[in-house]
């Protein structure tokens, strides 16, 4: 069935070989360079205004907040005399607005501030890792652009989050005034990797998230961020948020176009819709539905696929045992159909691995690292952690296509909290 599956994917512009790796890297590079210069691009290259070549202050505790999709964490972190991060205190609760009932932005801010209040009393620095789109400002604050579907908060768009949190803390009696910074999840992962890793081991660091969504960030000379005089004025090396999930210079296949047309954001986040866990399961299911429409699967399988609500865990199980006891295998009529679907899944995951690896290769190429350099890919996300095919294929592609640079994936526990600590204890 391999030839039939391959021919089917090629006919629908969905075979991985139809996007040559070198061309993907070239397009990523071109878009990165255009965005840095302020020209039209499908990626954003947003400066974080955080210097990446400064060591965090030692012996000083900083308030850290991790506002994720479903959970909120707050605590204190300091770096010891050896420069190693130490979590002094930590607590967790559900993210305000994630309980199913809509709240307003003021309530969200009040609940976050109240949750962090006991730690804020002892810190003059603070940093929040915010997992939703924000416009990070030169002063470290962040303006909320929108919140994801995981939380229901009205009136949050346009809010300067750090300023609002500081005002709320002062109303609650927190002494003094804290200096705030806001980082997104990929920046937090990169800084968390720098905080935890043996920094003598790596020539560079990349933050890479591939879970429900996807994003990457990198370290660049501030002088290269031509579109931002404030970032250029920082000097040295700063961290840049690629917003790689928005990359759009891709060959979209039939299933990609059909899913994009019915999405909440048609024409946007095209790479994310092709590779991330929140979308990949839909791409696989839609591709199999198309195969059923064309008579490549039985009517019984077609009906079962219509009823199946495919999850990432189901995809992972099918990767491991395509003929086994799992919902996707059970939805297909016989061994031959399961083999066909397994070939489709393998080739679509290869496509996702290539698109993901091309982003990392473009960053490494732009950094022009010496041959023999080792790069720490500070990684996070369930798709990278749990899917049994994707990351091994990414690593194999990178070894083949970028043999002069070793890219080592590291999953850092509490990466966002440690990254917030690094950001909050550098600069003024």
Regions found by a protein language model. Name each.
Residues 65-73, 131, 186-187, 208-213, ...:
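A short acidic Gly-Thr/Ser loop motif
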Residues 1-90, 94-124, 170, 195-196, ...:
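ATP-binding/phosphotransfer module of carbohydrate and carboxylate kinases, centering on a glycine-rich
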């Amino acid at each position: 069935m391999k030839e039939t599956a391959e021919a089917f994917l090629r006919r629908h512009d969905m075979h991985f070989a139809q996007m040559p790796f070198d061309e993907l890297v070239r397009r990523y590079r071109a878009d990165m360079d255009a965005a840095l210069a302020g020209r039209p691009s499908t990626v954003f290259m947003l400066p974080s205004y955080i210097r990446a070549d400064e060591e965090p202050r030692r012996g000083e505790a900083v308030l850290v907040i991790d506002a994720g999709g479903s959970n909120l964490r707050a605590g204190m972190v300091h770096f010891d005399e050896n420069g190693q991060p130490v979590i002094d205190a930590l607590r967790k609760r559900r993210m305000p607005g994630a309980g199913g009932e809509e709240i307003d932005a003021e309530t969200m801010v009040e609940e976050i501030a109240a949750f962090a209040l006991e730690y804020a009393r002892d810190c003059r620095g603070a940093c929040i890792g915010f997992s939703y789109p924000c416009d990070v400002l030169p002063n470290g604050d962040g303006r909320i652009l929108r919140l994801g579907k995981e939380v229901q908060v009205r009136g949050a768009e346009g809010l300067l989050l750090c300023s609002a949190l500081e005002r709320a803390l002062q109303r609650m009696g927190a002494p003094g005034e804290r200096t705030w910074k806001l980082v997104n999840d990929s920046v937090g992962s990169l800084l968390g990797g720098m905080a935890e890793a043996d920094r003598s081991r790596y020539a560079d660091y990349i933050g890479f998230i591939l879970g429900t969504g996807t994003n990457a960030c990198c370290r660049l000379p501030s002088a290269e961020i031509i579109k931002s005089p404030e970032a250029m004025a920082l000097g040295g090396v700063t961290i840049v948020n690629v917003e790689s999930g928005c990359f759009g210079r891709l060959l979209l296949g039939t299933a990609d176009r059909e899913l994009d047309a019915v999405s909440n954001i048609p024409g946007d986040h095209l790479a994310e819709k092709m590779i991330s866990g929140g979308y990949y399961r839909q791409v696989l299911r839609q591709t199999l539905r198309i195969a059923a429409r064309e008579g490549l699967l039985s009517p019984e399988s077609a009906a079962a696929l219509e009823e199946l609500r495919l999850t990432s865990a189901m995809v992972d199980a099918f990767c491991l045992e395509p003929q086994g006891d799992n919902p996707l295998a059970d939805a297909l009529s016989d061994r031959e159909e399961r083999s066909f679907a397994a070939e489709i899944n393998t080739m679509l995951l290869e496509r996702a691995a290539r698109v993901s690896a091309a982003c990392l290769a473009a960053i490494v190429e732009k950094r022009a690292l010496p041959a023999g350099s080792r790069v720490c890919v500070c990684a996070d996300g369930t798709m990278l952690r749990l899917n049994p095919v994707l990351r091994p294929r990414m690593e194999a592609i990178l070894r083949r296509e970028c043999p002069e640079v070793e890219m080592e994936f590291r999953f850092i526990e509490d990466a966002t909290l440690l990254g917030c600590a690094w950001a909050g204890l550098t600069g003024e």
